[in-house]
Amino acid sequence: MALSGLQRQVIHFYRRCLHAAKAKEQPYNERWMAFVHQEFRKNQTISKRDFFYIEHLLRVGQRQYEAYSRPEVKDIHFS
């Protein structure tokens, strides 16, 4: 089954986030990986046809990615 352009964008963004999480220092990278997984799982139930909301989440996620991927950001705490 062929993926839509938006699905490809989400998958590409997910992989970029995982790569950035793995690049964080030990032992923090495990928490970063858990954070990435949690954020994407949290939105897993969104309808594939809700394009505007998915695009909104990609924009918000991109801003978070830029903030969190800065070298001075070492650790993350979430619940």
Swiss-Prot record:
The keyword Mitochondrion applies. It is found in: Mitochondrion matrix. Its main location: mitochondrion. GO terms for cellular component: mitochondrial matrix; mitochondrion. Keywords: Chaperone, Mitochondrion. The keyword Coiled coil does not apply. One of its GO terms (biological process) is mitochondrial respiratory chain complex II assembly. It comes from the Eukaryota. Plays an essential role in the assembly of succinate dehydrogenase (SDH), an enzyme complex (also referred to as respiratory complex II) that is a component of both the tricarboxylic acid (TCA) cycle and the mitochondrial electron transport chain, and which couples the oxidation of succinate to fumarate with the reduction of ubiquinone (coenzyme Q) to ubiquinol. Promotes maturation of the iron-sulfur protein subunit sdh2 of the SDH catalytic dimer, protecting it from the deleterious effects of oxidants. May act together with SDHAF3. Belongs to the complex I LYR family. SDHAF1 subfamily. Interacts with sdh2 within an sdh1-sdh2 subcomplex. This is Succinate dehydrogenase assembly factor 1, mitochondrial.
